[in-house]
UniProtKB/Swiss-Prot annotation:
PANTHER family: UNCHARACTERIZED PROTEIN YQGE, UPF0301 PROTEIN YQGE. It comes from Burkholderia lata (strain ATCC 17760 / DSM 23089 / LMG 22485 / NCIMB 9086 / R18194 / 383). This is UPF0301 protein Bcep18194_A3962. One of its GO terms (cellular component) is cytosol. HAMAP family: UPF0301. It holds the Pfam family DUF179. Belongs to the UPF0301 (AlgH) family.
C-alpha cells in the first residue's frame, strides 16, 4: 500500500485519451480534472461540443439570455455521469460567490448551481467559461489503473486551451503541451 505522500495528485491536469482508448465515450477526448484524491476523480470533457447552444439551454431552464456573443456558444458533453446536470468550468470571478462552487487548486473553478448561469445571463458572471452537461468520474484507484494501462496521458492544464482554442483543436493543443502530436502516438503499449 502506498503512503499518502506517494500519491500523485492530478487535479488541474488534462487527461488526454490515448489512441488505444477502448471506451468510445472517451476516445479522442481531453478531460480537465477538477478533483483527484484517494476517493477517486472528477473531470469535464472539454472538446466534445453538443448540438445544444447556450440560448437553447437557457430557454429550457427559463433564463433569458440576451447577450448576442453568448447565444450560439455550444454546450459540451462533459462526461457520462449526471448528463442532465450542468457543470460550469470558469475562471474565478473576483467578489463573486456561487452556491455550489469548487475551487480547483492552482486553477479554475467548477460551479454546479444555477446562480452562475443567472450571473452569465446578466453579464456579471465569469467572462471565460465552458458549460457541460455531465461529468466524468472515476472510483478510488480506477483512474490510476487506466493510466497504468496507457489509457491516458497527463499534463498540467492550460486555461488557454479550455477557453481560447477551438474545440476541434484542443486534443492536438493538449498533446502539444507534451511536445508530441497524435501522429506520434501508437495504440500499442510495449516494453523496452
Amino acid at each position: 500500500m502506498s503512503k499518502p505522500s506517494d500519491r500523485i495528485n492530478l487535479t488541474n491536469q488534462f487527461l488526454i485519451a490515448m489512441p488505444n482508448m477502448a471506451d468510445p465515450t472517451f476516445s479522442g477526448t481531453v478531460v480537465y480534472l477538477c478533483d483527484h484524491s484517494e476517493r477517486g476523480a472528477l473531470g469535464l470533457v472539454i472538446n466534445r461540443p453538443t448540438d445544444i447552444d447556450l440560448e437553447s439551454l437557457f430557454n429550457r431552464i427559463d433564463l433569458k439570455l440576451d447577450i448576442e456573443p453568448l447565444l450560439h456558444i455550444p454546450v459540451y458533453f462533459g462526461g457520462p455521469v449526471q448528463t442532465e446536470r450542468g457543470f460550469v468550468l470558469h475562471e474565478p470571478v473576483e467578489g463573486a460567490s456561487y452556491n455550489s462552487s469548487m475551487s480547483v487548486e492552482g486553477g479554475l473553478e467548477m460551479t454546479t448551481s444555477k446562480d452562475v448561469l443567472e450571473a452569465v445571463a446578466t453579464g456579471t458572471g465569469p467572462k471565460r467559461f465552458l458549460l457541460t452537461l455531465g461529468h466524468a468520474g472515476w472510483g478510488a484507484g480506477q483512474l490510476e489503473e487506466e493510466i497504468s494501462r496507457n489509457g491516458w496521458l497527463t499534463v498540467a492544464a492550460d486555461p488557454r486551451i479550455v477557453f481560447d482554442t477551438p474545440a476541434e483543436e484542443r486534443f492536438e493543443a493538449a498533446l502539444g503541451l507534451l511536445g508530441v502530436s497524435s501522429s506520434m502516438l501508437s495504440g500499442e503499449a510495449g516494453h523496452a
